[in-house]
């Protein structure tokens, strides 16, 4: 019985913390003069709490594992909503596909460039290069 209560407590704590960050983000988004989704601000709050080690990752792991495991189910309502506008989407399919492809390439280039900027070039062990 004690082990069951411990597991229930871990899941309850994880979801309470995740939702607390979400609702804090929604509250802050309501106060801001610019439009930023509250869920994005909530994720940033959760990230900062975890990155600064204010909140141990073990506290949110059980809830995150469940959300990741069932993530595909969370996209079903979005897919159904998109299918309601299939005629409009079909009429604009070319521009949508082109914009997705171009934005993907831009993301690849920006991530590659920023990765090289942050990490720099490192010598690979066993690779022959310039002798200094």
Swiss-Prot record:
Keywords: Cell inner membrane, Cell membrane, Membrane, Transmembrane, Transmembrane helix. It is a multi-pass membrane protein. The chain crosses the membrane at residues 5-25, 38-60, 66-86, 93-113. One of its GO terms (cellular component) is plasma membrane. Disulfide bonds: none annotated. Signal peptide: none annotated. It is found in: Cell inner membrane. NCBIfam families: PRK01821.1. Belongs to the UPF0299 family. This is UPF0299 membrane protein KPN78578_25390. It comes from Klebsiella pneumoniae subsp. pneumoniae (strain ATCC 700721 / MGH 78578).
């Amino acid at each position: 019985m004690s082990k069951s209560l411990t597991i229930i407590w871990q899941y309850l704590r994880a979801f309470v913390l995740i939702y607390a960050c979400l609702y804090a983000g929604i509250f802050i988004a309501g106060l801001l003069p610019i439009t930023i989704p509250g869920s994005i601000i909530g994720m940033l709050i959760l990230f900062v709490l975890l990155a600064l080690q204010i909140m141990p990752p073990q506290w949110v792991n059980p809830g995150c594992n469940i959300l990741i495991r069932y993530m595909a189910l969370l996209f079903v309502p979005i897919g159904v909503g998109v299918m309601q506008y299939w005629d409009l989407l079909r009429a604009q399919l070319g521009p949508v596909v082109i914009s997705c492809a171009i934005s993907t390439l831009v993301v690849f280039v920006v991530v590659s460039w920023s990765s090289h900027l942050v990490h720099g070039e490192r010598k690979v062990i066993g690779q022959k290069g310039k002798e200094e």
